[in-house]
Design a protein with these regions (language model features):
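Central antiparallel beta-sheet cores of small beta-barrel/beta-sandwich binding domains
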Residues: 1-114
Length: 114
């Protein structure tokens, strides 16, 4: 099970640059995401996300407003061939999207507890 935290800054072109760490790491690593959908609303869209942990990783990233929220809480989903790898929630502080993320295994565990 993986539990982590992240932040993303958005470039003028709509791409994302940031850092993350999780329970299996002792340091922060970089992550970038190239926007592949039309850039209309800050942070909202579909991206191709890339980072290095032990090896290079690349997944699709979908960011949208969390359902039943005030459009100030964001829902993030990283997928590989439509299989969910990581889920996250975050919010904006000083134009930076910050939040927590977890893998699908931890998400199922949490859902079974409540």
């Amino acid at each position: 099970m993986v539990l982590g935290r992240f932040y993303f800054k958005q470039t003028a072109n709509g791409n994302l640059l940031g850092e993350f760490s999780n329970t299996g790491m002792g340091l922060n690593k970089t992550e970038s995401a190239d926007i592949i959908s039309r850039f209309n609303i800050p942070f909202i869209g579909t991206y191709r996300s890339t980072w290095f942990q032990q090896t290079a990783q690349s997944l699709n990233l979908e960011i949208q407003f969390k359902i039943d929220s005030n459009d100030r809480i964001y829902s993030l989903t990283w997928t590989n061939n439509n299989n969910v790898a990581f889920l996250a929630e975050g919010f904006i502080v000083d134009d930076i999207l910050i939040g927590d993320y977890r893998d699908e295994e931890l998400q199922r565990f949490i859902e079974n507890q409540f």
